[in-house]
């Protein structure tokens, strides 16, 4: 996928591109393994969120032995800045008992729980589990846990905006709103209605202290996506959206 958007999937390439585009740091949304050794990233470039995805579930029992202990081993690490959940793909409600210890651990360590919200890449996933209202429920029940709504719940923008505005412990990122290479001038012309809705709800809630830049790389070209978000977000809010909010919410210490 990286090659299709003009990139190479290796650290040297990303280091070069980060320098060219003045990207200070990245957060890797990890998946496929809870093994500590599988999450070895250059600390000058990346922090990571440890992911709990469907590949970790054993048969149909939805049981991961010692899950809280294994997640806590990551949260103890300085370079682990949170947890990533994929409820639509796992087909497990965010309110499921298996997740409750994870929310408490995240609160204890002061690290956020990022959640895939909105449209899924595979048709067999269940949207009801990744609708923004599912996040509202657990955010309200776990007020001491910081949550991040990934992809701004796209395309459920109205509900996403309501959940971010209502819950002080819910932030959102703007990753994954595009896919592939994009001619931005043509896109903003042809998708004017969609862009209008995005701008409308982002502007309506005025939660610019809780909205973060993100990419969902490698599905987008980094330079093009930065240009997309710059056209979407008013320039007066670029500093918090592109840097300050993520640095604070993920505790990056930059």
Question: Residues of each region from the PLM?
Answer:
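Acidic/histidine-rich helix-loop elements
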Residues: 1-7, 58, 182-187
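Active-site gating/metal-coordination segments in enzymes
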Residues: 24-25, 32-129
